[in-house]
Amino acid sequence: ITNVNQLWEVDLKYGYIAGEDRFFYLMSIIDVYDRVIIDYHIGLTCEGRHAAHILERSLWKRKLINTSTRPVIRSDNGPQFISNVFETACKTLSVEHERIPPKTPNLNAHIESFHSIIERDCYAKNEFNSYTEAHKTVTEFIDFYVNRYLHGSLKDMPPAEFHKIVVNTGLTPFIVRV
């Protein structure tokens, strides 16, 4: 991968709401090159329609919706990603959907890494009493990750800053091997 918007990864991460004794879902899309979480869904359910929605919003956010530039979207074989709704959205949006083989999370390493970070630095440090609290805390953490979290692989810059440099200068300082 040599630039932004070539390969995006999408996956789910569960979180627990102790005060309500139930789980919530975080579905995130990451750009493999700049590590920006382009869009995400936080909810008490997580279905193919949610995956389709954040994919379309990601294309809008990256200003790709009215261009011919399209990333490949890589996922595992979760029910959200093999659903007719998501597959139809990929076709309608002209996005190639690549599914990794079962039991190979290393092939989705960048989104898995982000989900490990959010587990360690957000979920494990907070006991959520309500869905509202979980939603607020996770949203704030994602904002922190995108705008202030320093990545060694991004020359010690936060993803958003690195993204701006790449887009504004055309600088592509490295190749990401996937």
Please identify what each model-predicted range represents.
Residues 1-28, 53-57, 61-62, 68-70, ...:
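Mobile-element integrase/transposase regions
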Residues 31-42, 51-54, 60-61:
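Electropositive, glycine- and tryptophan-enriched low-complexity nucleic-acid-binding patches
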Residues 64-83, 105, 155-160:
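Acidic/histidine-rich, metal-coordinating catalytic segments
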Residues 1-7, 104, 158-167:
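Basic, flexible linker segments flanking DNA-binding modules
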Residues 26, 47, 51, 74, ...:
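Hydrophobic (often cysteine-bearing) scaffold residues that line and stabilize catalytic clefts
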